Every structure is written in C-alpha cells, then in structure tokens.
Regions:
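Positively charged, small/polar-rich N-terminal and surface patches that mediate targeting and assembly
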Residues: 1-91
Length: 91
C-alpha cells in the first residue's frame, strides 16, 4: 500500500506497472501525520492510497523504487501486508 500526495498518482501508476504489478486500485483519502493534515479540500491538498496485490519480490522492487524517487521530496507512506487472495487466477 502506498499513501502519497495525489500529484504523484500518474507517476506511481507508471512505476508500479513497469515494475511488474498486474493492476492497482487508487482511492482518495484524508488524514493527519508527520506531513501535516491533508483534508483534500484543494487539489494540491489531496492524498491518494494505492493498493497493489503482487508477489513479495515485486512489492520489494516497487517499494525500493518509490522510496528512491519520491520519499525525499513528497509526503509518502508505504507498508506491506500479507493477504489471502480468493481469486488467485486474477493475479
């Protein structure tokens, strides 16, 4: 899961697909943390949550690239979680 400034959405989509993801889901989110409160009222204040179901090795590559390219200059959080997929043929 990647939580990032909405301005990164297009770049993140390009990155995760290029790095081996078969798909993703993006939703608008709001919250508060180290980067301040993001309420999504203004376009520049929007935050997105990108969920990617993929093999662990692909997740590692995506996380390394996202951290390398964006973590220094953008509000960004990433985390891994293990899931049980009910329709594995889709992934």
């Amino acid at each position: 899961v990647i939580i990032a400034e909405a301005s990164l959405e297009k770049l993140l989509v390009e990155d995760v697909m290029r790095l081996g993801a078969h798909g993703y889901t993006v939703t608008d989110v709001r919250g508060s943390g180290a980067s301040g409160t993001r309420e999504g009222i203004w376009e520049v204040d929007r935050t997105v949550r990108m969920e990617i179901l993929c093999e662990g090795t692909v997740a590692d590559v995506i996380a390394e690239e996202v951290m390398r390219r964006y973590a220094t200059n953008y509000g960004l959080s990433l985390y891994f979680t293990e899931v049980d997929v009910l329709r594995p043929e889709k992934y």
